[in-house]
């Protein structure tokens, strides 16, 4: 299936999986999606992820969702900011920090995709991909 916005598809699969309280969700592999999964893991929003590649087929990423003891999802919300039809670029001073720094912004910079706080520390801006809280 051809997807016009792979990042939005990635976020939607995670959102739907947490609402249905699935243990994991599968998404088609791409380098961007693997980087997003790595950021979510490092920031504590998901348990883990696993890249699976079957011979002769496109790979998949299995994302293991994280829940609190009361089966409440750690990811409460996801929002796509920069879209294919309307890109949103920010300087390092304008990268959003919200929910008392409990939320996460993800930025695509000239040095790669990274968490907003890391981009701010490095003093680089870029395309604001999404917000996660």
From Swiss-Prot:
GO terms (BP aspect)? translation
Please provide one cellular component term from the Gene Ontology annotations of this protein: ribosome
| Highest taxon listed in the record's lineage | Bacteria
Q: Which UniProt keywords apply?
A: Ribonucleoprotein, Ribosomal protein, RNA-binding, rRNA-binding
MF terms (GO), sorted A to Z = rRNA binding; structural constituent of ribosome
- Which Pfam family, any one, appears in the UniProt record? Ribosomal_S8
- What is the protein's known function? One of the primary rRNA binding proteins, it binds directly to 16S rRNA central domain where it helps coordinate assembly of the platform of the 30S subunit.
Cite the record's note on assembly: Part of the 30S ribosomal subunit. Contacts proteins S5 and S12.
PANTHER family per UniProt: 40S RIBOSOMAL PROTEIN S15A
Q: Which family does it belong to?
A: Belongs to the universal ribosomal protein uS8 family.
Q: Report the protein name in the record.
A: Small ribosomal subunit protein uS8
User: What organism is recorded for this protein?
Assistant: Protochlamydia amoebophila (strain UWE25)
């Amino acid at each position: 299936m051809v997807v016009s916005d792979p990042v939005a598809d990635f976020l939607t699969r995670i959102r739907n999986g947490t609402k249905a309280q699935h243990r994991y969700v599968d998404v088609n592999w791409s380098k961007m999606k693997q980087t997003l999964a790595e950021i979510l893991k490092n920031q504590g929003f998901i348990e883990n992820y696993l890249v699976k590649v079957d011979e002769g087929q496109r790979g998949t990423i299995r994302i293991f969702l994280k829940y609190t003891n009361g089966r409440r999802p750690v990811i409460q919300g996801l929002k796509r900011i920069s879209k294919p039809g309307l890109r949103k670029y920010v300087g390092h001073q304008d990268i959003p920090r919200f929910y008392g720094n409990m939320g996460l912004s993800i930025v695509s910079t000239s040095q790669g995709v990274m968490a907003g706080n890391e981009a701010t520390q490095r003093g680089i801006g870029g395309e604001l991909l999404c917000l996660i809280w």
